[in-house]
Amino acid sequence: MKRFLTILGLCALPLTLTAPQMAAADGATDAVFSVAIRGITAGTLTVKGSESGGSYKASGVLQSGGLVGLVAKVKYTASASGRVKGNTFSPSRYDEKADTGKRKSSASMTYKGGVPSVSDYVAGPNVVKPSTQKGTVDPMTALYAAFRDVNKDEVCKLDVKMYDGKRRSQVKLATPRADGDMIKCDGEYRRLAGFSSEDMAEKSRFPFNLYYAKTADGRYRVEKVVTHTLYGNAVMKRK
């Protein structure tokens, strides 16, 4: 399940939200980002979500494009739903489908009492047991939590832990500051558990910057993400 996020080479965005609970208005997010790695167009990421009456629904599509798309046709889709209160998400279901051009696969997670149950769980030496991951969120919920439109007092306030069915990781946003007409955040993705010793030795922390811009209705939306990845410098820009 990690591929929906890690395929970007963008630090696998994701994520129990521990940031202070704020009063967030019901609303919707509909964003399309171009993805470029080392200046080469790699594809697009679409993130959609809505919140109403304490519930949320979110979906995303990651698809290869540009020169990368000529080499490999890759498409990942995911959806998630659950409850939301302020900045705290409690997922109830997550579904993912992947088409790598060579094979197709699907996976899902459901939650009971905040504990995930994985459809394709297979125990292994590095695999984190789902029964130990109470309070974590799925990759799509994590992505939506990081990329949704927010009020000004919620900008750069995120500290979430994610479980993808095998691995546990964390994403933090902090230090909001003006950068031209946008607000810049410092972010970090951290591998926590379930990764091989080689992966941890190679790199366990991935810094990035996220940029918000003010919208016509006075809220703030993500316009750009910049990071250094194992694949080179990566930039996501909102279309």
Protein language model regions, located:
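Compact, aliphatic and Gly/Pro-tolerant "microcore" segments centered on a short helix or tight beta-hairpin
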Residues: 8, 22-25
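C-terminal segment of classical bacterial N-terminal signal peptides
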Residues: 14-22
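Surface-exposed, polar helix/loop patches in the mature regions of secreted/periplasmic/lumenal proteins
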Residues: 89-145
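Bacterial N-terminal signal peptides that target proteins for export
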Residues: 1-9
